[in-house]
C-alpha cells in the first residue's frame, strides 16, 4: 500500500501507525465523489486512543505546513473526521 501513497497520505498513515492505530485503510474516491479524493479510515481502542491518533496526525501536518481545513468529532473521540484539504 505505501508505494502508492502521496506525501500527505503517507504522513497521515505513518502518524497513525506510530500511535498504534489499526485497520488502516486508504479509499480512493477520485472517480466516485466530487466531495473528496481520498478517505483514510483507521481504528483505536478507546476514545483517548482515537484522540491521540488524531493529535499525532495533526501535529505532523502542522510541522509540515499542512494546516487542516476542519476537524469534527474530536471531543467525543468515538469518531473523528479531519479534512486535510489537499
Please describe what each predicted stretch is.
Residues 82-84:
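Active-site beta-strand termini and strand-to-loop segments that position acidic
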Residues 1-34, 47-80:
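Polybasic/polar functional segments that serve as interface/processing modules
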Residues 41-44:
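Short hydrophobic/aromatic beta-strand micro-patches
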Residues 36-38:
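Short amphipathic alpha-helical segments
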Amino acid at each position: 500500500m505505501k508505494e502508492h501513497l502521496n506525501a500527505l497520505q503517507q504522513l497521515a498513515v505513518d502518524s497513525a501507525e506510530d500511535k498504534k492505530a489499526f485497520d488502516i485503510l486508504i479509499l480512493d474516491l477520485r472517480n466516485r465523489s466530487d466531495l473528496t479524493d481520498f478517505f483514510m479510515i483507521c481504528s483505536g481502542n478507546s476514545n483517548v486512543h482515537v484522540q491521540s491518533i488524531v493529535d499525532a496526525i495533526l501535529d505532523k501536518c502542522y510541522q509540515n505546513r499542512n494546516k487542516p481545513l476542519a476537524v469534527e468529532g474530536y471531543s467525543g473521540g468515538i469518531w473523528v473526521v479531519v479534512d486535510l484539504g489537499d
